[in-house]
Amino acid sequence: MAYKTSLDNLAKVVTIIITILFAVIIVGQFSLIKDEGKSVPTFTTILLSLIYFGTFSFRPISYKLTDDKLIIHRPLFDIKINRTEIKNVEQLDKEKLSWAVRIFGVGGLFGYWGKFSNAKLGSMTWYATRRNNAV
């Protein structure tokens, strides 16, 4: 079974705002810094581009459940989890996910993925594009 992903409204808004912000910073810095060396704008452009396209490349685009694996498809490097490693599956309500803290991950730009933690569930790894219907 294959399932396509779609962004929730918050992820859409965050993605649009970050895209506009990065574009304004990249274009604006070159117009403001004319007489100085171009090393700072070039470095900033490379850094913001790496952040943006790196995040884009690792976002979940679909999920596939096979007889032996759960596959999270991403533009780069699919995640494959053996079904034998999955201890249980349950739908999580907002209360269980409340106060989740992003330890190392993305919280809105093209989705929500990476390492998160909260007091109720402990350490979690997310590969999500929506905050509702969490499993």
Would you name each region that the model predicts?
Residues I46-E90:
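Conserved beta-hairpin
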Residues H73-V135:
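Non-transmembrane, membrane-adjacent beta-strand/coil modules in membrane-associated proteins
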Residues A11, G37-K38, K64, D93:
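General structural signal for secondary-structure boundaries
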Residues K34-I46:
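Hydrophobic alpha-helical transmembrane segments
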Residues A23, S39-T42, R131:
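Short hydrophobic/aromatic-rich motifs at helix boundaries and adjacent loops
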Residues T19, V24, T44-T45, L50:
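Small-residue packing motifs within transmembrane alpha-helices
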Residues M1-E36:
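N-terminal membrane-targeting/pre-transmembrane regions
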